[in-house]
Structures are given as structure tokens and as C-alpha cells.
Design a protein with these regions (language model features):
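Primarily recognizes the serine-hydrolase "nucleophile elbow" in alpha/beta-hydrolase
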Residues: 147-189
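N-terminal cap/lid segment of alpha/beta-hydrolase-fold proteins
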Residues: 12-64
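A short acidic, amphipathic alpha-helical/loop segment
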Residues: 82-86, 176-177
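N-terminal low-complexity, Pro/Thr/Ser-rich intrinsically disordered segments
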Residues: 1-9
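Structural recognition of the beta-strand scaffold that forms the well-ordered cores
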Residues: 68-71, 94-97, 163, 185-188
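Cap/lid segment of the alpha/beta-hydrolase catalytic domain
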Residues: 85-144
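Short beta->alpha connector loops
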Residues: 74-78, 168-170
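Short beta-strand element of the alpha/beta-hydrolase
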Residues: 54-57, 64-74, 94
Length: 189
């Protein structure tokens, strides 16, 4: 099949990021002036189910409301606790999400089997090439995860404003969600 070039408008026009999150908090731990919670939220619907997005949500201890930051780390790398704690000390909440998917042991974003190419370790051609349309790439799925995560963070009742920080691959993803996501500002590093 010949490649089909899609503009950003046509690429995302049928995307539905309004489905309910059905969040599931898994654990709660207090440390260094923060409360850390592991959370799963549901993302986009595919033919084989919904993406189950894994994240860690940090909130500053003792604050009822605060601004928050979505952090998109480098693909395949774990959370940078030092960076997270920098924001916590400044009074921000932080949501660090996994978009890399299955990389080994531990909690991760779970992609339905029809979009297995979203798992960073198995992305293959879907990361570097567009064989049909951009919708069949890892980048599309990672961007979809970021759109859901940004909306979840912005809709939290305790969050007064939401920004985002992206590191390397995470920064590239932020450029892709900027026109669509409910974030007030972002920086790509």
C-alpha cells in the first residue's frame, strides 16, 4: 500500500481522548516531603481493548492544591527521582508516565496486542518508518498516551495549573501534543 501523508489535523481528527480514565491507584508511599502513588489510567480504545497507562503521581505533602508537571522521560529509561524531587521541593505535583511499555520486570504501560509496536523494545520499523500512515507508528501511540496523561493531570481537582517537561524522546512527544493537550506550558530538553 502506498504511503498516505496526513496533516496533523487529519491525523488526529478522529482521535477520542474523552473516554473515562477509570483510574486505579495501586500503592501509596510517603517520602522526602511527597506522597507517591502508582496509578493506572485507561487510554485510547483499540480493536483489542484500551491502553492501560502506568504512571507515578507525586504530590507535595501538606498542600491541598498546587500546580503540577507532567514529565515525559527518555524512552526506555526509568523515572529520574532527582528531577521529580526538585519540582516537589518547589511545591509542584508531578506525574511521570511510562510510554515505553514492556521492557522487563516492573509496572509499565500495557498496550493491546494490535498495537504491540508501541512497546519500545519491540517497536522495530514502527519507530523509524511509516509503512501505511502515521497512525501505525510507535510515535502515534506514545503521543496518544501523553494526550491522555496530560488531560488526567489537568482534570485533577487539586491541580491549579499543568505544565510539562520532556526529556529527549519525551520532549519530541511533547511537541506532538502541544496543539491538543490541556497544558499551560511545556519545555523540551
Amino acid at each position: 500500500m502506498a504511503n498516505t501523508i496526513l496533516t496533523p489535523i487529519t491525523l488526529w481528527k478522529d482521535f477520542d481522548d474523552t473516554l473515562p480514565f477509570n483510574e486505579e491507584f495501586l500503592s501509596k508511599e510517603e517520602r522526602e516531603g511527597a506522597v507517591m502513588r502508582d496509578v493506572y489510567i485507561l487510554g485510547r480504545q483499540t480493536g483489542f481493548g484500551r491502553v492501560k497507562i502506568y504512571g507515578r503521581y507525586y504530590t507535595p505533602n501538606g498542600l491541598e492544591s498546587f500546580p503540577a508537571v507532567l514529565i515525559m522521560f527518555e524512552a526506555g529509561f526509568p523515572c529520574d527521582e532527582k528531577l521529580v524531587m526538585h519540582f516537589i521541593r518547589k511545591g509542584y505535583g508531578v506525574l511521570g508516565i511510562d510510554y515505553s511499555g514492556e521492557l522487563g520486570d516492573g509496572r509499565h504501560t500495557i498496550y493491546p496486542r494490535d498495537i504491540d509496536h508501541a512497546n519500545f523494545a519491540r517497536a522495530g520499523r514502527a519507530m523509524d518508518y511509516v509503512d501505511e500512515t502515521a497512525r501505525e507508528t510507535s510515535w502515534y501511540e506514545w503521543t496518544a498516551v501523553a494526550r491522555y496523561a496530560a488531560r488526567w493531570l489537568k482534570e485533577r481537582p487539586e491541580v491549579t495549573a499543568a505544565g510539562a517537561v520532556g526529556l529527549r524522546t519525551g520532549g519530541e512527544i511533547l511537541w506532538k501534543i502541544a496543539p491538543y493537550a490541556p497544558i499551560d506550558c511545556f519545555i523540551s530538553i
